[in-house]
């Protein structure tokens, strides 16, 4: 085993959408920095970013009902929906900039216009959906949203969903043509190809073994070349851990105080994938339903048109599975090894409190294929068993952490953890994840490059014209920027 030493300015751990985005931002803002990226697999974007390991929804709260809460008085709080949409607007602006400048090309290879729709059944749910739309339509970001209970209108949007449906059933559906399907794996590959052209060191089949703080304030990152078994010690001023499910174990190796009292619970996803081309081509939308009362946000059912390498696909899910692995290509010991003295109480507290999650997972694990098809028939009443197959999607590690309110709180969003001195950052969690990558990486830069960030703002505003402002509060700016975005990304 040979040990070598090398110095660099930035180390990115993980070859997914987060590291690719942060690397791209850094090369635009400070091109002189030396950057090294390490990925354990043989190519980028193969874990959570892979097209089959996520639903590819450009999360904009156009269809996801869990981003709007209903109050006891019937009012609907749209605060989170606006925030999620604003984050995706930032991503789209940055991608449009990269296309305009020629850094990446062929947007149709990673983003497609696919209408986003919400679908509910029952009088109470219909009432909620109407209130939701009435609240959202007042905001410029949601001005194109439509709602209908008319069977003929709904049939014109999603004919397959109306075939065989009972006419006396109370249903309502929303429709927003500005929705998108995003292949984050393809986008990741484009971003990393661009980084390679800018002399970023892209190292595949390299596994990070350890991360240690040095006396001089830098980090020592121990990396093993899986091709040769050589081990190299890298010294870096800044480290970003964007390794999906592996981020938590790597963060724990740093021993920073911010890594304490954080745990993770892995959940795997299963989808039904359509095998019948006729069915696939007769549906063109991402249709999100409503989770059962008490079920976790990850359980929201959706019927998704996908585009994979130019070919149209159709998925339904997710159904939860369980594996103690933190990555699809991980170890069965991942969960056990993540339990430390400093997070044991955190994990146990969550186990006691999260009865609904436990109940949901047990019920999901007991589902037969016939029962999964029955769930699909809520969306497609005439779905045939032989047209669908089960596929395993990616692993998600839900963050468990102590909060001011209590110990062991399960978190369903995306979490950025940074060291006190800003020399290290890690990304944990799941949805909305990739859709918000650009905004999240701006957050990382603001926290970790405080002294430089102000001087970067003119360039940032060139890349993302709305930076620092809320498009939801600047109607004219939104329309102006959106026209540019539509032109370069070729979306509606």
From Swiss-Prot:
Secreted as UniProt keyword: no
Cofactor names: FAD
InterPro entries: FAD/NAD-bd_sf, MQO
Any GO BP annotation: tricarboxylic acid cycle
Transmembrane portions of the chain: none
Domain of life: Bacteria
Organism: Staphylococcus epidermidis (strain ATCC 35984 / DSM 28319 / BCRC 17069 / CCUG 31568 / BM 3577 / RP62A)
Cross-referenced HAMAP family: MQO (MF_00212)
Pathway where it operates: Carbohydrate metabolism; tricarboxylic acid cycle; oxaloacetate from (S)-malate (quinone route): step 1/1
This protein's name: Probable malate:quinone oxidoreductase 1
UniProt gene name: mqo1
EC number: 1.1.5.4
Keywords from the named record: FAD, Flavoprotein, Oxidoreductase, Tricarboxylic acid cycle
Family to which this protein belongs: Belongs to the MQO family.
Catalytic activity: (S)-malate + a quinone = a quinol + oxaloacetate
Any GO MF annotation of the entry: 2-hydroxyglutarate dehydrogenase activity
